[in-house]
């Protein structure tokens, strides 16, 4: 008897274990959106809290969260800082993991008032959900006398990394500040400024001279930090507008004009009357005293020379896009500190540490013009796409390395020949994308892609299945916001093995980027949780559930899957 019971248990375990061998490789291991991102809300009079419990291995996109009131007035919602996630197609995006709490201040809500909350997320395994929309009913709330927005709480979980939002870290601001110090408008002024800071006294202890120079630099840094905070705060209010294509194009034009001013095409500075007033205010301060030196530094931060106006404006405009006040203030502080380091050295050690003035200072100014030109390319790349973005980077690289090579020809030193060879090689490498675009290249030819027939509704799908004429059908769901869909397109569908395996298959594709009513109806009808999802139908128009693919597959795996699904 005991042996029979043992045998029965063994058979049951074996059945459970071997059942997994017959599972389809494409069967979804992903949970529905409501389980991946558990949404909840709680209202206490004017205070409303929206919360998401994010399942392990999933994340929400910060920029995809929108909150729209109906019959209600709410304070400006400030989403907490997230963590940074990077992929090949969309670059860096701010995301939330584990748990997200968003406080909302309800200034006034009439009877029947609601909030429409839209959000979207993905799985780390390469599976994205369509945007989810929830309607939050609001309790009736009378208008408060003094309704102020509640500051957003921080996300629990991973540590945010706001500095990663910029293509250059805040440390670059320090290096840019040091570089600006060696432009022709700034470097010759350091000995004069040093004398003013010391109050005309030549015999001061090293410690006293260093202290006065440091105080002057801190005064200058205070002005720049305040500018950074103000601009970042203003950018925070208009952050969504700053991502609009027209605004990005406008910013790109402004950055280009700033770069042209660094090339000497025109001069950009404060009006002379305002500069004169600031200079007179600075001259009234007493040099050699900590208080007077600090005020002189603060005023000096407002007097922008032609060499510093363009880089400062570029940094301020870029900070406005981040909307991060800590990053804005810190970046401008490091920028001012970089400009002040040479001044501190001159004040303590004298002019002997400064390099001699010469044409090289104009070259430094021009080089910063090329640095500023990188910002328009970075902004336009979001609009024009990866291919054209690469061509713009190529054009900028050719221009910079070509200019540097021509400039280096004036040098007489032998070791500069090595530098010239490196610059020439860099220019030749940079020109390759432009060469492939203009003349074509066998190695650079875009791979052939599958020729899909577009469908958008259930009726169109049924009609396409009826017209398949006894052939198997593959239906691919695609959306612009689906990273893995783009990976399928670039790496899998372009593979010759995949194209050969699909030679006798009718190819359909549903683009659900808009996520409108007919898209939602199609997804619901076919029980599609998210993207990428690929469905297969047999010659009779019946879906083969075991062949369904959810999540990304590389070319080899997908090709094997296509062969395995064949009857």
Swiss-Prot record:
Tell where it localizes: Cell inner membrane
Enumerate the transmembrane spans: 166-186, 211-231, 246-266, 299-319, 326-346, 360-380, 387-407, 418-438
EC no.? Answer: 1.8.1.8
Q: Which SUPFAM superfamilies match?
A: Thiol:disulfide interchange protein DsbD, N-terminal domain (DsbD-alpha), Thioredoxin-like
The positions making up the signal sequence are 1-19
Q: Where is the Thioredoxin domain?
A: 435-567
Recorded topology in the membrane: Multi-pass membrane protein
Q: Biological process (GO) annotations?
A: cell redox homeostasis; cytochrome complex assembly
Keywords, comma-separated and alphabetical: Cell inner membrane, Cell membrane, Cytochrome c-type biogenesis, Disulfide bond, Electron transport, Membrane, NAD, Oxidoreductase, Redox-active center, Signal, Transmembrane, Transmembrane helix, Transport
Q: Name one GO cellular component term.
A: plasma membrane
Q: What is this protein called?
A: Thiol:disulfide interchange protein DsbD
Upper lineage ranks? Bacteria, Pseudomonadati, Pseudomonadota, Gammaproteobacteria, Enterobacterales
